[in-house]
């Protein structure tokens, strides 16, 4: 298994099987009954990556302490001698059930899998664990939500970081695992299928989630092999080698290397996970708090849309073919801080997939779109919702070239399109939070040009170098597509063409030169 990974899941399954056989062989001489060797955590899911810990529970029913010590030495010590990172716990039935009051132990036990020994013992413990966790699902999910928020704050809350954490980052493997655990506590069965049956995610969502998860698992195996340790961060220094291990090849030019292609695949997979998790999690936690059958959730209505538990729904009687529907959705989601519900997202995605759509641009829709961008960071989530459904590219076809596109540049933190939306959000936040910026904005007679210039400043990076030049015709096409007045279009072109002027001057010229200052001001 050392060479891999053509397929990360196959690699993990093969390595898991090797460890299973070793544990079974080691346990056989000391197993006198009422003993079970149980794989938990990632090992229980059969997702052992090269640098993963092998987490084992030695479960017993009435063994004496001395005999247990002999069993641990026989089962665990040889694996340590083989340089495996083995973590273990020894518990009886009662202890194993009580231990799930600790969140990390609970999540590990939700993925418990029999390796060898007394299967009935594990089954009885599993029933007790499920019963204990299901008594207070809100407590478990509150703790899991806090843990998820903590890890995102630590490693980054954006699914398009240029050095992503494959396990703990937004849209990472842990987000899918959290959904599986939530199903176990709320619905009594761990996995994605129970969430489909209960309506939290759709069958197409499940398929997309599995594909995205498997892509990240393959990346994680390759990253562990290249780094030589359990490092879950896909750092710049290993991206080229990881890309080759994952089967990517170089394209044409410095912006289409194997590593760029790997990162683009990762960004789109992470977005899929991030959106599915965010959409389902609000409903799952609300149902855990108030009861799935007992509660009558509070509803709000914005425009023609319904908002329940932070999830926005377009009622079935409301046509999605209205020319300004996406713009109204964007405005409503921003105003209500909501995400699209599963059915609405599916309707929109199906409409995009059907081909030609009825959504158009004119002065009112363009003004509504830009008014959302001026809301700053509040617009990022709603824009991402339209991106996930394909509506954004349907509205702006030229956006397809930058969607999920990697830019391996230490001066940037995100994918090309995410960088553009963050730049627009930064402008919106600036004028909302800083008085001097708001005053300066009042003196600008074409705010459309300013916002569009910021949004489109790097659009040329998908079309060759120098990107400040290649971006000009693309920006012009987009402005004309949006129906911008010619004067606005010209100003956007100029902003795109000269967006590197000030940073270049600031880093290469004498800023005390009065003549230089006048020259730049005239430009």
What residue spans do the PLM features occupy?
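Catalytic glutamate of the conserved HExxH
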Residues: 458
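A nucleotide- and high-energy phosphate-metabolite-utilizing enzyme signature
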Residues: 1-452, 462-523
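Walker B beta-strand of ABC/ABC-like P-loop ATPase nucleotide-binding domains
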Residues: 455
């Amino acid at each position: 298994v050392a060479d891999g990974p053509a397929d990360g899941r196959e690699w993990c399954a093969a390595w898991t099987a090797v460890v299973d056989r070793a544990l079974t062989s080691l346990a056989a001489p000391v197993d006198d009954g009422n003993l079970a060797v149980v794989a938990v955590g990632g090992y229980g899911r059969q997702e052992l990556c090269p640098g993963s810990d092998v987490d084992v529970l030695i479960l017993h029913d009435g063994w004496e302490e001395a005999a247990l010590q002999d069993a641990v030495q026989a089962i665990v010590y040889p694996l340590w001698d083989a340089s495996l990172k083995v973590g273990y716990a020894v518990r009886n039935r009662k202890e194993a059930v009580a231990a799930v009051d600790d969140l990390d132990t609970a999540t590990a036990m939700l993925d418990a899998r029999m390796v060898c020994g007394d299967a009935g013992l594990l089954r009885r413990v599993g029933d007790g664990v499920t019963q204990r966790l299901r008594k207070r699902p809100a407590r478990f999910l509150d703790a899991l939500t806090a843990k998820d928020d903590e890890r995102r704050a630590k490693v980054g809350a954006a699914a398009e970081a240029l050095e992503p954490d494959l396990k703990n980052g937004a849209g990472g493997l842990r987000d899918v695992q959290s959904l599986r655990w939530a199903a176990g506590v709320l619905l009594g069965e761990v996995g994605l299928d129970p969430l489909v049956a209960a309506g939290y995610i759709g069958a197409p969502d499940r398929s997309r989630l599995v594909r995205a998860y498997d892509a990240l698992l393959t990346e994680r195996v390759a990253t562990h092999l290249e780094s030589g340790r359990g490092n879950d961060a896909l750092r710049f220094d290993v991206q080229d080698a990881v890309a080759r291990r994952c089967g990517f090849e170089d394209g044409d030019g410095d912006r289409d290397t194997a590593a760029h292609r790997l990162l683009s695949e990762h960004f789109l997979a992470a977005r899929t996970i991030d959106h599915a998790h965010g959409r389902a999690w609000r409903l799952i936690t609300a149902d855990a708090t108030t009861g799935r059958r007992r509660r009558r959730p509070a509803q709000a209505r914005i425009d023609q849309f319904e908002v329940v538990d932070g999830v926005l729904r377009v009622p079935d009687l409301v046509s999605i073919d209205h020319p300004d529907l996406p713009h109204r959705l964007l405005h409503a989601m921003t105003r209500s801080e909501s995400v699209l519900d599963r059915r609405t997202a599916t309707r929109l995605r199906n409409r995009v997939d059907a081909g030609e759509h009825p959504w158009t641009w004119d002065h009112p829709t363009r003004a509504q779109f830009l008014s959302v961008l001026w809301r700053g960071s509040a617009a990022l989530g709603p824009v991402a919702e339209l991106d996930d459904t394909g509506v954004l590219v349907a509205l702006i076809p030229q956006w397809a070239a930058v969607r999920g596109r990697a830019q391996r540049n230490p001066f940037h933190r995100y994918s090309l399109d995410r960088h553009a939306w963050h730049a627009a959000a930064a402008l919106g936040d600036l004028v909302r939070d800083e008085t001097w910026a708001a005053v300066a904005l009042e003196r600008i007679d074409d705010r459309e040009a300013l916002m569009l210039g910021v949004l489109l400043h790097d659009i040329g990076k998908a079309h060759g170098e120098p990107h400040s030049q290649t971006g000009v015709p693309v920006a012009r096409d987009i402005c004309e597509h949006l129906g911008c007045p010619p004067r606005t279009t010209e100003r956007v072109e100029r902003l795109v063409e000269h967006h590197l002027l000030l940073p270049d001057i600031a880093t290469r010229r004498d800023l005390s030169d009065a003549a230089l200052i006048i020259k730049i001001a005239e430009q």
